[in-house]
Amino acid sequence: MGIETEFGVTCTFHGHRRLSPDEVARYLFRRVVSWGRSSNVFLRNGARLYLDVGSHPEYATAECDSLIQLVNHDRAGERVLEELLIDAEARLAEEGIGGDIYLFKNNTDSAGNSYGCHENFLVARAGEFSRISDVLLPFLVTRQLICGAGKVLQTPKAATFCLSQRAEHIWEGVSSATTRSRPIINTRDEPHADAEKYRRLHVIVGDSNMAETTTMLKVGSAALVLEMIEAGVSFRDFALDNPIRAIREVSHDVTGKKPVRLAGGRQASALDIQREYHAKAVEHLRNREPDPQVEQVVDLWGRTLDAVEAQDFAKVDTEIDWVIKRKLFQRYQDRHGFDLSDPKIAQLDLAYHDIKRGRGVFDVLQRKGLVKRVTEDETIDDAVENPPQTTRAKLRGDFITAAQAAGRDFTVDWVHLKLNDQAQRTVLCKDPFRSVDERVERLIASM
């Protein structure tokens, strides 16, 4: 599993000189380019850091094989970007450009642009992809009910609270495009592994989450549904009449009870659909090896659905992003008498996703103990420096660390490790589960 996160970037200036988003992004990545000779690099912890289309910094975690490991490495991405932010602000100050840089782990900006949080799952090549997409699509359309990041949407009539930031920007169900049409599931076949054994399922519909528990639920529930599909579990047919209309309808309904149209004229609510998937997950747990992390996911999944059904969120208001955010807005409105259309609510919405510690609203809530965690600061710090020790990422991270220490010129990607010397020595690592490889050890020893 892995998560790719694009960050929103902006800068407020104290003086007269202004910088475009492109220029701000270049300041952010100046330190990266100075050592990596590129704005597209792999790090010692196995992750990829690069400047994506539209001046959005993007962090792709290393391959992870457990949910807690993935959450730690996702949070490590925030720390890596925060370091770049602090360094860039110092450079601006040195050049007499007073300004504060903001990086937001969200999915929309004030101009209506959207940027993503993509989940990657390694699935077996065997079997029909259409079965995966048929079962997964209704799940993903309604999953925002349990793991949306929440958003205040300004409409011509009034401001309204929505479950998902990403839902309004999705235009296809299944497609090979990522930016033009923004599908729910991307079918571009780039397994980054042995293509005869595996395919990489690329889910681009999810919101960027701040709460660790929500990230764990988002990825863990999807991974469990995929596991059940591969195990041959049968699901009720929830094929949607129009997934693009449905995803918006679900996002606008915090009760989860409004019916969406299914194929053939049937109807079901988001709550109905999620209840079915959750019930199958509970049943599946009885037949699989015990895993406390997966059990934690299924427990939170069920509690969140119960909270939505009862419209009583007290038992999940420290664990689910959209619930945390909605409670924050309601308290702010009660205190100041604002309605949702007030610019200060929009400002609070954005500040929730500010990744700078001590400034971002989510970080303030976390420091006050108002959101639940599954990591420790120490484990996140470790993930900033070190790759997962149980996947191929360890080979990549060890190789990069050794090559940098030896001052060697090298090239890496997800599957290749290459020393750029006269011999052009390259090792191909096609097994994402393999963390020990004699060929890589010999390559490192040769430096």
Curated annotation (Swiss-Prot):
InterPro entries, A to Z: Pup_ligase, Pup_ligase/deamidase
Protein name as annotated: Pup--protein ligase 2
Recorded coiled-coil stretches: none
GO annotation, biological process: modification-dependent protein catabolic process; proteasomal protein catabolic process; protein pupylation
Its biological purpose: Catalyzes the covalent attachment of the prokaryotic ubiquitin-like protein modifier Pup to the proteasomal substrate proteins, thereby targeting them for proteasomal degradation. This tagging system is termed pupylation. The ligation reaction involves the side-chain carboxylate of the C-terminal glutamate of Pup and the side-chain amino group of a substrate lysine.
Species in which this protein is naturally found: Rhodococcus erythropolis
Binding site for ATP: R48, T61, W414
Keyword annotations from UniProtKB, A to Z: ATP-binding, Ligase, Magnesium, Metal-binding, Nucleotide-binding, Ubl conjugation pathway
Highest taxon of source: Bacteria
Active-site residues annotated for this sequence: D52 (proton acceptor)
NCBIfam families named in the record: pupylate_PafA
EC numbers on record: 6.3.1.19
Record carries keyword Ligase: yes
Note: The reaction mechanism probably proceeds via the activation of Pup by phosphorylation of its C-terminal glutamate, which is then subject to nucleophilic attack by the substrate lysine, resulting in an isopeptide bond and the release of phosphate as a good leaving group.
Family: Belongs to the Pup ligase/Pup deamidase family. Pup-conjugating enzyme subfamily.
Record-listed Mg(2+) binding positions: E4, Y50, E58
Catalysed reactions, semicolon-separated: ATP + [prokaryotic ubiquitin-like protein]-L-glutamate + [protein]-L-lysine = ADP + phosphate + N(6)-([prokaryotic ubiquitin-like protein]-gamma-L-glutamyl)-[protein]-L-lysine
